[in-house]
Amino acid sequence: MDTQSFKTFNAKPDEVERDWYVVDATNQVVGRLASQIARVLRGKHKPTFTPHVDTGDYVIVVNADKARFTGKKEKQKEYHEYSGYPGGDHSHSPEEMRADKPTYIIREAVEGMLPTGPLGRDTFKKLKVYAGPDHPHEAQQPEPLDNA
């Protein structure tokens, strides 16, 4: 019997090969798009996935300002921030956030779906979000992401 086929594969950080993917967020639902992006960033779409190693790929999101919410979330959802000072608690609707920081909505949704800690922070750095249709990563030859 071949015992090699029963061994669990553990990826090593220097052996990981990373691809680049591009996603068009136009008319995509924010939460569903974010879960697909988080899956690719984490590396769970690969057979070489290892939980304690960053095996994920790079993801470029274009047209992030055109992503949408379902239901009444566009008006009722709130993003909270706190400056640390008394009276420094502020709430913003997605409409306000989209006008001020168009990439914030996608970045916040994806970050919430990644692990907290050093591995999650390193994983999040592989996400590149742009409000318009152009991005500066043409040299990496990104492929379109199938599921998103």
Curated annotation (Swiss-Prot):
Presence of keyword Ubl conjugation: no
**Compositional bias segments (type: Basic and acidic residues):** 71-81, 89-99
Q: Which UniProt keywords apply?
A: Ribonucleoprotein, Ribosomal protein
Q: Please give the GO cellular component terms listed in this UniProt entry.
A: cytosolic large ribosomal subunit
Region annotated Disordered, chain positions: 71-99, 125-148
Gene3D superfamilies, A to Z: Ribosomal protein L13
Q: What Gene Ontology molecular function terms does this protein carry?
A: mRNA binding; structural constituent of ribosome
Q: Name one Pfam family in it.
A: Ribosomal_L13
Q: Which GO terms describe its biological process?
A: negative regulation of translation; translation
| Family that this chain belongs to | Belongs to the universal ribosomal protein uL13 family.
Function, as annotated, reads:
This protein is one of the early assembly proteins of the 50S ribosomal subunit, although it is not seen to bind rRNA by itself. It is important during the early stages of 50S assembly.
Under the heading PANTHER family, the entry gives: LARGE RIBOSOMAL SUBUNIT PROTEIN UL13M, RIBOSOMAL PROTEIN L13
Query: What assembly does the database describe for this protein?
Result: Part of the 50S ribosomal subunit.
What is the recorded name of this protein? Large ribosomal subunit protein uL13
Q: What organism is listed for this UniProt entry?
A: Salinibacter ruber (strain DSM 13855 / M31)
Provide the gene name from the record.
rplM
